[in-house]
UniProtKB/Swiss-Prot annotation:
Organism classification: Eukaryota, Metazoa, Cnidaria, Anthozoa, Hexacorallia
Family, similarity comment: Belongs to the Cnidaria small cysteine-rich protein (SCRiP) family. beta subfamily.
Protein name: Small cysteine-rich protein 4
Entry's transmembrane regions: none
Protein localization: Secreted; Nematocyst
Length: 81
């Protein structure tokens, strides 16, 4: 019985450790975005617009280095070429 309890506690501890690591990574990404470390927000002006992910209209190309506020949106940049 003691072995089962010990195993259960180890499983719970492992799950909490993984959950903490994932949420910590999300906080680090948010912090990096706020300070310009990874990528910057799509401007939503004439040259950069947020559209549904993977659906840039004619004259625009996908700009993966910029992000929109929603995971279902992607930034599209005016394609000058």
């Amino acid at each position: 019985m003691d072995t089962k309890v010990a195993c259960l506690l180890l499983i719970i501890l492992g799950a909490l450790t993984v959950q903490g690591a994932v949420s910590g990574n999300k906080r680090m990404n948010l912090h990096a975005r706020q300070w310009g470390g990874i990528e910057r927000e799509c401007m939503n002006n004439g040259e950069e617009q947020c559209f549904p992910m993977g659906q840039c209209p004619g004259g625009f190309r996908e700009c993966s280095e910029y992000y929109c506020g929603s995971p279902s949106l992607g930034c599209c940049c005016w394609d000058e070429w």
